[in-house]
Amino acid sequence: LLTLPELCLTGYTCGDLFFSDCLLGAVEPALARILEQTAALSTVFTVGLPLRFGGKLYNCAAVVHAGRLLGVVPKTYLPNYGEFYEQRQFSSASVLGGNIYDLTLCGQSVPFGTDLLFACAELPDYTFGVELCEDLWVPCPPSTRLTAGGAAIIANLSASDEVIGKADYRRMLVSATSARLACGYIYCSASPTESTQDMVFSRHHLIAENGTILAENEPFADAELTITEIDVQRLMHERHRTTSYDAVPGLRQIVFHQP
């Protein structure tokens, strides 16, 4: 499972260029090219992109596998404080309500919403959900519902900037969330090349399993990939052992196949 940063297809710091038809019109062709170039790969990966739907613009994560769009997840919590002003350009997924949506993207009918779980047919414990950056930092993150619904892993596409002490807090947040939810947590933030306007990014990568940080890169390092393994069978055992871990129904499960 490869997790890429938030809005990586266009860049996070585009500002009011997100209102540009030229920029938004280039998103789908770029995504179609990614689908074409990765059709022979077995890796599942997430791509951050802006997406228009129902007359509104959403900050989204597209889940891609073997040339197929498995689903698109819009961001729920949009920061609008300090150096962040996402509500200026984007709408929250909360405006979708509890309705079930599909959209047409790159010639495919694609599930759209925050109610999506992605499950491997050959590996029943390999089920994951997706949230985006600020979704993790709120009191009731979407990952709570996703893991209760069966997700063993959460992928977080992020563009979290650097200020004094923030990396330590981010590390603690990812570790604590993976412990509380008995899950694997993959966190991928934007790289230094995104450092424009009034924010600095360090390419902070974190991978945690049930409270333990398994892998982390050095901030501002040149290495672009942080790789490790998550023991999903151990996570499932922990959930079975902890009988207070209640299941949550009502999520859509998108099944994919691995060779």
Annotated model-derived regions:
Residues L1-P259:
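Enzyme catalytic cores with a strong preference for nitrogen-chemistry domains
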